[in-house]
Amino acid sequence: MRINQRDIVNVEFIFPDGKAKNHYAIVVSNNELIESEGFVYLVLITSKDYNSNYYYELSNDMVLNFSFSKQSYVKCHILMTTMENIVSFPLGQIKKQYFDKIVNKIIYSIF
């Protein structure tokens, strides 16, 4: 397994309308699922700040070994599933305490 939960990766993110664009994303699936099935759940990171009810604002102090060049937001209502071998190697990692808050915001946003 080359990626883990909380990793920041770069991936061709496929949106609900079928369009695709390279974006940063956070691996949200747990390591057991990645290992056993070979696929990952990802949540979108973008510099767009619309739909504030559904985003989690990021800052560089929330991240290990990586810096965003622009203000960035996790779009907690936009997730994607893809195969592990499709995503880039980890670029950095979200610190655990912030990842837990992001997961809670995903749950709030979707359920």
Predicted regions and their residues:
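Compact nucleic-acid interaction/catalytic patches
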Residues: 19-62
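C-terminal terminal-subdomain/extension
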Residues: 1, 63-111
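Short, charged beta-turn/beta-strand-edge "cap" motif at the junction between a beta-strand
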Residues: 14-18
